[in-house]
From Swiss-Prot:
This is Cytochrome P450 26A1. GO terms for biological process: central nervous system development; kidney development; negative regulation of retinoic acid receptor signaling pathway; response to retinoic acid; response to vitamin A; retinoic acid catabolic process; retinoic acid metabolic process; vitamin metabolic process. GO terms for cellular component: endoplasmic reticulum membrane. The gene is CYP26A1. It is found in: Endoplasmic reticulum membrane; Microsome membrane. Keywords: Endoplasmic reticulum, Heme, Iron, Lipid metabolism, Membrane, Metal-binding, Microsome, Monooxygenase, Oxidoreductase. It catalyses: all-trans-retinoate + reduced [NADPH--hemoprotein reductase] + O2 = all-trans-(4S)-hydroxyretinoate + oxidized [NADPH--hemoprotein reductase] + H2O + H(+); all-trans-(4S)-hydroxyretinoate + reduced [NADPH--hemoprotein reductase] + O2 = all-trans-(4S,16)-dihydroxyretinoate + oxidized [NADPH--hemoprotein reductase] + H2O + H(+); all-trans-retinoate + reduced [NADPH--hemoprotein reductase] + O2 = all-trans-18-hydroxyretinoate + oxidized [NADPH--hemoprotein reductase] + H2O + H(+). It is a peripheral membrane protein. Its main location: endoplasmic reticulum. Induction: By retinoic acid. Its cofactor is heme. It comes from Homo sapiens (Human). Heme binds at C442. Expressed in most fetal and adult tissues with highest levels in adult liver, heart, pituitary gland, adrenal gland, placenta and regions of the brain. Expressed at high levels in lung, pancreas, skin and uterus (at protein level). Lower expression level is detected in spleen, kidney, intestine and adipose tissue (at protein level). GO terms for molecular function: all-trans retinoic acid 18-hydroxylase activity; all-trans retinoic acid 4-hydrolase activity; heme binding; iron ion binding; monooxygenase activity; oxidoreductase activity, acting on paired donors, with incorporation or reduction of molecular oxygen, NAD(P)H as one donor, and incorporation of one atom of oxygen; oxygen binding; retinoic acid 4-hydroxylase activity.
Length: 497
């Protein structure tokens, strides 16, 4: 074969497909950008739209932190991209986030990716809008009143104490912290939010099966909206269906108990409140909506708190001087003495633990469990000199906003004392947003704060521990967790500081 023939063959085999691929990317970019509002003179934010149809979803899923850091360095606090099948503008920074969070119903509305809406369902709180969202949120908020939280304290303390005893019994072999914390938080969420014992959800292995199903659903929650066998959406829906089947048993048992007046007059869990709200309005119970709400409550009630609690163990293990200060605060309140270790915690005591509150805040600043929130533009509007076209998705980034917040110095340092200092209310309001903000802020944030405080108190006054692999590499999918599941060895703390 002559040289011209070889060159022609190489052209057909390598060069031509490459040129076609580059042309396809350019045409895709032009197609996406054509969705701009031509009646608005402002430019679109800078950025790229990735590959045809897939956009930049795969890059973000596979290299999340590296990908997002590269984007921030290249484009700044606002840029366009294409994620989960939609043209998207990603924003960060207190001023930009303020516009988004305070613009609910006026500029933007909540709009999670299609995969999230499909898996969680239209009947869950995060996917409701307007009056339906307002009414549902009002009902669920009653489960997180101060009176209700006071009732939850002994339940949380009991579950945490039981888990710590098991961790301590592992001895030298140690354990994987993250899976254990997830099981703990799942049991707490089952008891408090759904009002049922985990082991009563079905057969003897139901707790572990439900936890594993939630893990599978969570892994595939943010997927391309393609429902074919073995796709992420397909696997997520399959896990969701298993969860619904298990939860339906609990819901039917709950309904029978309420009709028989077995619930008593004590604190009401969120599921009971939703059922009674339907009865009070004379509505027929919608089993599908109850299953969707229960799944959402369990997901939010254990997935995010497990992430935060694991990060607490990580940072307190890496910074012993902070753990020392936690114990000094406990000692000052009489909570570290042997004679007082059996005293019951209550809301009044927990609210006095200011430094522990700062440790939790600093943990949530560095490792917010949820990295951001999703909105859709209701109309074209201006943000930082760029147009946000009507119909485009808007993602506000919690983790990036914390990273760039000007009110924090030495941002990469774990320093709970920074929260002991007063910050201007207006400046800090949107610089620290682990629970989101505005009308769509996390409905269970006070529950999460109390749970994490109790967890920290019990951990600090009963345990010492060693992280066997040192500082872990963190990954987000969709909540933050350690890639190695955080192997650690726990030993008894003997009360001496």
């Amino acid at each position: 074969m002559g040289l011209p023939a070889l060159l022609a063959s190489a052209l057909c085999t390598f060069v031509l497909p490459l040129l076609l691929f580059l042309a396809a990317i350019k045409l895709w970019d032009l197609y996406c950008v054509s969705g701009r509002d031509r009646s608005c003179a402002l430019p679109l934010p800078p950025g790229t739209m990735g590959f045809p149809f897939f956009g930049e979803t795969l890059q973000m899923v596979l290299q999340r932190r590296k990908f997002l850091q590269m984007k921030r360095r290249k484009y700044g606090f606002i840029y366009k991209t294409h994620l989960f099948g939609r043209p998207t503008v990603r924003v960060m920074g207190a001023d930009n986030v303020r516009r988004i969070l305070l613009g609910e119903h006026r500029l933007v509305s909540v709009h999670w990716p299609a995969s999230v809406r499909t898996i969680l369902g239209s009947g869950c709180l995060s996917n409701l809008h307007d009056s339906s969202h307002k009414q549902r949120k009002k009902v669920i908020m009653r489960a997180f009143s101060r009176e209700a939280l006071e009732c939850y304290v002994p339940v949380i303390t009991e579950e945490v104490g039981s888990s710590l005893e098991q961790w301590l019994s592992c001895g030298e072999r140690g354990l994987l912290v993250y899976p254990e914390v997830k099981r703990l938080m799942f049991r707490i969420a089952m008891r408090i939010l759904l009002g049922c014992e985990p082991q009563l959800a079905g057969d003897g292995d139901s707790e572990q099966q439900l936890v594993e199903a939630f893990e599978e659903m969570t892994r595939n929650l943010f997927s391309l909206p393609i429902d074919v066998p073995f796709s992420g959406l397909y696997r997520g829906m399959k896990a969701r269906n298993l969860i619904h089947a298990r939860i339906e048993q609990n819901i039917r048992a709950k309904i029978c108990g309420l009709r028989a007046s077995e619930a008593g007059q004590g604190c009401k869990d969120a599921l009971q409140l939703l059922i009674e709200h339907s009865w009070e309005r004379g509505e027929r119970l919608d089993m599908q909506a109850l299953k969707q709400s229960s799944t959402e409550l369990l997901f939010g009630g254990h997935e995010t708190t497990a992430s935060a609690a694991t990060s607490l163990i990580t940072y307190l293990g890496l910074y012993p001087h902070v753990l020392q200060k936690v114990r000094e605060e406990l000692k000052s309140k009489g909570l570290l003495c042997k004679s007082n270790q059996d005293n019951k915690l209550d809301m009044e005591i927990l609210e006095q633990l200011k430094y522990i509150g700062c440790v939790i805040k600093e943990t949530l600043r560095l490792n917010p469990p949820v990295p951001g929130g999703f909105r859709v533009a209701l109309k074209t509007f201006e943000l930082n000199g760029y147009q946000i076209p009507k119909g485009w998705n808007v993602i506000y980034s919690i983790c990036d906003t914390h990273d760039v917040a000007e009110i924090f110095t030495n941002k990469e340092e774990f320093n709970p004392d920074r929260f002991m200092l007063p910050h201007p209310e207006d400046a800090s309001r949107f610089s620290f947003i682990p629970f989101g903000g505005g009308l769509r802020s996390c409905v269970g944030k006070e529950f999460a704060k109390i749970l994490l405080k109790i967890f920290t108190v019990e951990l600090a006054r009963h345990c010492d521990w060693q992280l066997l692999n040192g500082p872990p590499t963190m990954k987000t999918s969709p909540t933050v967790y350690p890639v190695d599941n955080l192997p650690a060895r726990f030993t008894h703390f003997h009360g001496e500081i």
